[in-house]
Amino acid sequence: MAWFKRQEKGITTATEDKMDVPKGLWYKSPTGKIIDADELARNLFVSPEDDFHVRIGSATYFEILFDNNVFVELDKNMTSKDPLHFVDTKKYAERLKDVMEKTHLKDAVRTGVGKSKGRELVICCMDFAFIGGSMGAVVGEKIARGIDHAIKNKLPFVMISKSGGARMMEAAYSLMQLAKTSVKLAQLAEAKLPYISLCTDPTTGGTTASYAMLGDINISEPGALIGFAGPRVVRDTTGKDLPEGFQTAEFLLEHGFLDFITPRKELKDKINLYIDLIQNNDIR
């Protein structure tokens, strides 16, 4: 049939005749580089051509840092109880249920205890997939308990931050976690135990205003967004153009807010090096 006689525009194909292309075969970085998904995974989710660090969750960080991915998870079934009965576009309780089913996570942080390069340590790692890695009562409590475990067992503590900040659905309960976690880190310091803080993309809001910037050594992955308010909010509030690269890890390193930028492939070696140096141990 000639195109000018067609009743419908475009090309139509019966559903049963369409080709199903599996998702995840290829990944396109923000700079336009294309990489095979399997190769990306083998490269620890770092694009080899432009060194772009793809966001990963706690499961992958634990696999990278713990020897043979062997660890014990603390408080893994702790969940929020919606004390304010908060409702926005949907009930907070329903939102929690939906995101738990989608992510298979209980909240936005997990705590693991295991060996890294042969020595035991405690790692708390945030998951951005769970309501933007927002910090609520469960996040604060799990971090506090992780620090308590480190103090009790005289272990180094590592915090991996990846968060949009405080969880608005928990209001003051969320803001209380800034003080709680900061006090616990002060207790860790009194016990003379190392605290390594790793900021990943993005680390913003209340996390930056509390535990993310309180490490004995503060490090970051390349290119991570780190700040309090986001760049757009700062620009709209001040009415001024921001410096190039504002709130990137590289900008913060240049201005003294970070100690080191560490590529993902070097994280395990570097974190353990910093711990050994702080504790005056033999370098592993």
From Swiss-Prot:
Gene Ontology CC entries for this record: acetyl-CoA carboxylase complex
Catalytic activity: N(6)-carboxybiotinyl-L-lysyl-[protein] + acetyl-CoA = N(6)-biotinyl-L-lysyl-[protein] + malonyl-CoA
Chief location of this protein within or outside the cell: cytoplasm
Keyword Cytoplasm appears in the UniProt entry: yes
Pathway: Lipid metabolism; malonyl-CoA biosynthesis; malonyl-CoA from acetyl-CoA: step 1/1
GO biological-process terms attached to the record: fatty acid biosynthetic process; malonyl-CoA biosynthetic process
Pfam families the record matches: Carboxyl_trans (PF01039)
Origin: domain of life: Bacteria
SUPFAM superfamilies noted in UniProt: ClpP/crotonase
Keyword Oxidoreductase on entry: no
GO molecular function: acetyl-CoA carboxylase activity; ATP binding; carboxyl- or carbamoyltransferase activity
The protein's Enzyme Commission number: 2.1.3.15
Matches recorded under InterPro entries: AcCoA_carboxyl_beta, Acetyl_CoA_COase_Trfase_b_su, ClpP/crotonase-like_dom_sf, COA_CT_N
UniProtKB keywords: ATP-binding, Cytoplasm, Fatty acid biosynthesis, Fatty acid metabolism, Lipid biosynthesis, Lipid metabolism, Nucleotide-binding, Transferase
HAMAP family: AcetylCoA_CT_beta
Quaternary structure (record): Acetyl-CoA carboxylase is a heterohexamer composed of biotin carboxyl carrier protein (AccB), biotin carboxylase (AccC) and two subunits each of ACCase subunit alpha (AccA) and ACCase subunit beta (AccD).
Family of this protein: Belongs to the AccD/PCCB family.
Functional note: Component of the acetyl coenzyme A carboxylase (ACC) complex. Biotin carboxylase (BC) catalyzes the carboxylation of biotin on its carrier protein (BCCP) and then the CO(2) group is transferred by the transcarboxylase to acetyl-CoA to form malonyl-CoA.
Official protein name in the record: Acetyl-coenzyme A carboxylase carboxyl transferase subunit beta
Species name: Flavobacterium johnsoniae (strain ATCC 17061 / DSM 2064 / JCM 8514 / BCRC 14874 / CCUG 350202 / NBRC 14942 / NCIMB 11054 / UW101)
